[in-house]
Design a protein with these regions (language model features):
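Terminal, non-catalytic protein-protein interaction segments that mediate quaternary/complex assembly
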Residues: 1-242
């Protein structure tokens, strides 16, 4: 990876690029890396954790997953992070706002809306979060004529070796699920990345991965009878060919 060397809060040197664009077509395959083993169970558990609006890591421990342990407090709490903001954003008068359900409802009634946005960057609560959101905002784009749904994600910070593969697959799965709920087909997943960085201690592994030949493309199957985002459960998701 080209780019200047930089130092960050971790104390590990990175190579960084600013303003990286990534586009992933979803109509014929599902994006999960095959040049290294990616723990799909962790991705699945995390996404459904987000969708439930939870902020405690107990469900991860019940599934022997430790990806959030580093940031949780002694009680397993992470503060008002992704799921809380997406499903219960605090309103001006003390009410909560379910951003994700509002987007789904709007796609159904007004698919050409330019307000199909879910944001996790609540400035007033950043200090209460154990880790500020990396993937900050996502915007859906519906094509009613073709019945295609796309998703653009803005990610302020992307660890390209470890974090980005998770984020790519997780958001692709989210797009598939929302598309099914509204009767559309998933089309494109797009990322706009602010700081895309490779840690110095990952460089050798990254070079090795680049030398590997990818396996056949994967496909995703969802339970076709689910039409509400809160009806979906992890058992509805089947990854074919991994």
């Amino acid at each position: 990876m080209e780019g200047p060397e930089r130092f960050d809060r971790t104390g590990v040197v990175t190579r960084s690029l600013f303003g990286v664009h990534l586009e992933v077509p979803l109509s014929e395959s599902f994006p999960l890396l095959t040049t290294k083993k990616v723990h799909f169970k962790s991705i699945l558990c995390e996404l459904f954790w987000f969708l439930r609006g939870e902020t405690n890591i107990r469900c991860f421990h019940q599934n022997q997953i430790t990806i959030w342990d580093e940031w949780a407090d002694a009680n397993g709490e992470l503060g008002p992070i992704y799921g809380h903001q997406g499903r219960a954003w605090p309103g001006y008068r003390g009410e909560t706002y379910d951003q994700l359900q509002a987007v789904i409802d709007t796609i159904r009634t007004s698919p050409y809306s330019r307000r199909l946005v879910v944001s996790a960057w609540n400035v007033g609560q950043l200090a209460e979060m154990r880790l500020p959101p990396c993937h900050v905002l996502c915007q859906f784009y519906a094509d009613r004529l073709r019945l295609e749904l796309s998703l653009r994600v803005y990610q302020r910070s992307a660890d390209v070796f470890l974090g980005l593969p998770f984020n790519m697959t997780s958001n692709a799965l989210l797009l598939h699920m929302v598309a099914q709920c509204v009767g559309y087909n998933p089309h494109h997943l797009l990322f706009a990345i602010g700081d895309a960085h490779l840690y110095k201690n990952h460089e050798a592994q990254a070079r090795l991965q680049l030398e590997r030949k990818p396996y056949a493309l994967l496909t995703l199957r969802l339970n076709p009878y689910r039409r509400g985002i809160d009806e979906c459960v992890p058992a509805d998701v089947e990854l074919v060919g991994y």
